[in-house]
Curated annotation (Swiss-Prot):
Pfam families noted in UniProt: RTE1 (PF05608)
Protein name according to UniProt: Protein REVERSION-TO-ETHYLENE SENSITIVITY1
PANTHER family: PROTEIN REVERSION-TO-ETHYLENE SENSITIVITY1 (PTHR20921:SF7), TRANSMEMBRANE PROTEIN 222 (PTHR20921)
Disulfide pairings: none
Role: Acts at an early step in the ethylene signaling pathway. Positively regulates ETR1, leading to the negative regulation of ethylene responses.
GO cellular component, one term: Golgi apparatus
Knocked-out gene: effects: Enhanced ethylene sensitivity.
Subunit structure: Interacts with ETR1 through a region corresponding to its ethylene-binding domain.
Membrane-topology annotation of the record: Multi-pass membrane protein
Domain of life of the source: Eukaryota
Distribution of this protein across tissues and organs: Strongly expressed in 1-4-day-old seedlings in the apical hook, cotyledons, root vascular tissue, root tip and root hairs, with little or no expression in the hypocotyl. In light-grown seedlings, expression could also be seen in the apex and young leaves, and disappeared from the cotyledons by 10 days. In mature plants, expressed in floral buds, the style of mature flowers, stems and the rachis.
């Protein structure tokens, strides 16, 4: 009877040790590779309207005169070019609608989940993120959202520029969240956004101050009550529609 050739115990132990070392370094290696993919961003150039990886905001004509917290926003590529959903089936590229940005907030790319495959998620959502649509890079997320919104109808109350930015942030799973919507995007920018300069502040609030003053002088205090009611109704609509009737809001 011939004996089968066995594998020496020393070789088995050595192979297990090698496998353990491979497993122990594989995850950090992936993370380091992902961080290496995030090349340095160019500097923000307000004069040329280049805001790398920023959310940008500008006041809307007439609407912002009555409710200055409402404005038009866009999201910028890594090279600083602004993309914004400005009308039905239309995404502006490097031509921000309604004037130059007045406020901006630069986002941190390291807070994005950019999985190379199903097993590469750094967020808690995994399959849900994949099903919604993931991105390998920041610009890839913007390109995917652009293709999606090129087939959507613009509506200031249900599907607007904030919806486009929220869609991009959900593809990026920014901050570990896929719950971005037009309300929390607006609040994020309102709380953490930076004014570009003093003239941006004036441009954003002076028309509202003038309209309010003229209204009080010509109509009286009822105008102020009506203006406050208008702002409150707008705010209530976006809150209720976003969190209570999710099928209405894009």
């Amino acid at each position: 009877m011939s004996r089968g050739r066995g594998v020496p115990m020393m070789d088995l132990k050595r192979s297990y040790d090698v496998e353990d070392r491979v497993v122990s370094v594989s995850i950090p290696s992936i993370i380091e590779a992902d961080e290496a993919d995030l090349w340095p961003l160019p500097e923000i150039d307000t004069k040329k309207s280049k805001f790398p990886c920023c959310i940008v905001w500008t006041p809307l004509p007439v609407v912002s005169w009555l409710a200055p917290f409402i404005g038009h926003i866009g999201l910028c590529r890594e090279d600083g070019v602004i993309l914004d959903f400005a009308g039905s089936n239309f995404i502006n590229v490097d031509d921000f609608a309604f004037g130059p940005p007045a406020r901006y907030l630069q986002l941190d790319r390291t807070k994005c989940c950019l999985p190379p495959n199903m097993g590469g998620h750094t967020c808690k959502y995994g399959f849900k993120h994949t099903d919604f649509g993931t991105a390998r890079t920041w610009d890839n997320a913007l390109s995917s959202s652009t293709r999606s919104f090129e087939h959507k109808t613009y509506n200031i109350f249900t599907c607007n520029c904030h919806s486009f930015v929220a869609n991009c942030l959900n593809r990026l799973c920014y901050g570990g969240s896929m719950e971005w919507n037009m309300v929390n995007v607006a609040i994020l920018l309102m709380i953490k956004g930076k004014w570009i300069n003093g003239s941006s502040v004036v441009r954003s609030f002076l028309p509202c101050a003038v309209v309010t003053s003229l209204g009080v002088v010509l109509v009286g205090w009822p105008f102020l009550i009506g203006l406050s009611s208008f702002s409150l109704l707008l705010f209530a609509w976006f809150i209720i529609a976003t969190y209570c009737f999710k099928n209405i809001i894009t």
